[in-house]
Structures are given as C-alpha cells and as structure tokens.
Amino acid sequence: MRFFRVYGMSIVLSLAVLYVSIIRTVPEFPDLQFRWMDKVAHFIMYFVLSGVVCFELYRQRYDFSDRQMRLWGLIYPIVYGGVIELLQENFFPPRTGDWSDWVADALGSVAAYFLAKNLLPKYVKPEDQGLSCR
C-alpha cells in the first residue's frame, strides 16, 4: 500500500494518459485550435508524466545517475507513448496511431527529464531514509 501512496500520482497520470488516448472522441476547443495543437498536447502530457515520475523517484532518494531513474523517468514514458500509439492504430478505432505523436511524446519526456535533473537537486529535498519505498 505504501507503494501506491508514494508513486500514486505517477500511476494516476499514466492511467489518465491511457484513458485520454483511447477514448473514442476527444473534446475539441475551437478557440484554442492551431496547426500543431495535437503535438503540443502530446508534448505537454508526456512532459508532465515524466516530470512527476522523476519527482516521485527523486523524493525516494533515487539520484539522476541511478539506473532506475533513467528507466522510469525517461525510458518508461517514451516506451509507454509508443505502445499507446500502436494500441490506437490496432485496437481503438476511430483513433489512429501517429509516429509524429510519439516523437512529441518522446520530446516531452526528454525535456522534462533534463529539466528535472537540473532543478530537483536544487529545490527538492529527498525524504528521510526511514520513509523510503525503495
């Protein structure tokens, strides 16, 4: 149960991204439409997902030189985005997979990872060892 309390936001965001990615219709906001809006939305979703994963791992004393941080904070969101694009293409009509969406996902994840790598050590204090979920 402690795992869900510590990493709950990462889990909730992962499920929210999946849900938004597979629902049949996505609400449109005509006043906010512009040419690359879809790509910007993908970038932001995965930027937030990767940033939150990095934050929760860092709070549990995972350093950015740690393999687990790279795996879950960077690789997981990128692979997750690719898997969702494949699922959209093959199992959730009328949704379609788009590799340029996946590139936007990956760029958002990479941007968040490197921003977190530079900002978290300066502004966020890891939890005490006794509270760690490691």
Where does each model-flagged region fall?
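Bulky hydrophobic segments
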Residues: 1-134
